Each structure stands twice: as C-alpha cells, then as structure tokens.
C-alpha cells in the first residue's frame, strides 16, 4: 500500500466514524414553525382555559425558571388537566406550574412534572385537580433534538 492509499483509507475511516457519532437530526426551523402554527390553528376542545406553545433546544436537561409560557386568569377557576404534545420522535419532560389563591389573600405555586411525554401525532392528557387557580405556566425540556411543544390548559373559569 502506498502512503496516499493509507491516508485515503484513514480519512475514509474517520469520516465513517464521525458520521456514526453525529447528533440525531431534527426538524428544520420551518418545520417547527409550521407544526406550532398547526397546533394553534386546531379547533379548541371543550373547557379550554388557554394554550401554550414553545420551542425546545436539544441538550437542555433542566426546566427554565420562570416557565417558558405563563397564562394568567382574571377570575380564579378550576384546573382539570393539561393536554401535552411535542413534535417529532422521542420524548419531552414538562413542568406545569399551578398558581392558586390562598385564603389569606396571597398566592401559592406548585410545580407538577410530567416526565417522558412521548412526542408524535397523539397528545397526552394529564389530569390535574386544582381550584382557585389564577395562573398556569408550562415549560418543555430535556429533548434529544430541537423541536417544539404544545400544551392545552383545561378547566373552567369562575369555578
């Protein structure tokens, strides 16, 4: 073997190894935007208090503080649950921050984590049972690729 053929073989081997170690590909920014728009354009379900949509970056293992999207309600209501979805394959973790009015006039926030919500065409319903709700925040995180998430907040106001 000549030096040239050894060098070419080494370069080919390195290229092959590098190809096997690349990060998983995700949707393009245009695909993410189109998916987010389609979620916002869908017919609202009964009992919709609000919706939240956000982008997620790969390799962010911890939730943001404060939540990525926060919804506030002028009149305290009842929270029945959330419908969570995310773009692509894999899974995503969600933190849902529920802020309630306290009897003494202050507020209290509790964070509920929904881990490993599968991404794909089907949304996942998660039950929550809270009254006197004045705000809900949502954060999606711990993705293995860039993408997006969507959450529908379900319940009733004035309850």
How should these model regions be labeled?
Residues 24-73, 155-158:
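Transition segment at domain starts
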Residues 72, 81-87:
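Short edge beta-strand/loop segments characteristic of extracellular beta-sandwich folds
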Residues 1-21:
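Sec-dependent bacterial lipoprotein signal peptides
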Residues 64, 100-129:
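An anionic, turn-rich surface loop/hairpin at beta-sheet edges
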Residues 2-3, 28-29, 93-98, 125-132:
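Extracellular/mature segments of secreted proteins
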Residues 90-109, 149-154:
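Short, surface-exposed beta-strand/strand-loop-strand elements in extracellular ectodomains
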Residues 77-83, 124-152:
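Noncatalytic modules at the cell exterior or secretory-pathway interfaces
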